[in-house]
Amino acid sequence: YFKKLGIVIKGFLKRRRELKTIRQYDIVFIQREAFMLGSTWFERKYAKRSTIIFDYDDAIWLDLVSGHNRVFRFLKNPDKTGKIIRLSKLVFAGNQYLADYAAKFNQNVAIVPTTIDTAVYQPAYRTDKEKVCIGWSGSFSTIQHFETCLEALKIIKEKYGTVVYFK
């Protein structure tokens, strides 16, 4: 827990320093949130000093906390997402579901998909025997979502053997 506390303190100090220079920027992109705790204090300060574009690709307003972070639940504020969206000049949402939520607070919403549309972008056919890497881009606190894929990944590994590896 002390390691997480150190991360929070470092993040707070970094954001405080940024406030001094924020007027130098025409646009400030906020991805997810400016500070991990429940307050929108930093986002409100940023909005007074610059133009905010909010970019998100997860349903972060839902009150979901992993088992690892349950002790810190009281520090979270799911309503924060809507408040940040209201402060923003533009919102980039990763999909239609997120865009629909954002539209409740801000009409200037654009969908920027976080997944690749394989109907538009066709993978190149591979003729070589290189290994294929399958990666996970989640975090320790969202590992339960990854765990739902384990059976499928085992089947892939059984079928393709050493041609496939995981990161």
Language-model features and meaning:
Residues 1-5, 53-82, 117-119, 129-130, ...:
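Acceptor-binding helix/loop patch of EC 2.4 sugar-transfer enzymes
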Residues 52, 91, 109, 164-166:
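Hydrophobic/aromatic residues located in beta-strands of well-ordered beta-sheets
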Residues 32, 95-96:
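Helix N-cap/beta->alpha junction signal
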Residues 112:
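Hydrophobic residues at beta-strand termini and immediately following loops
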Residues 117-121, 127-167:
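Conserved catalytic-core segment of nucleotide-activated headgroup transferases in glycan assembly
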Residues 11-25, 37-48, 54, 58-62, ...:
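Membrane-proximal helix-turn-helix segments that form the acceptor-binding/catalytic region
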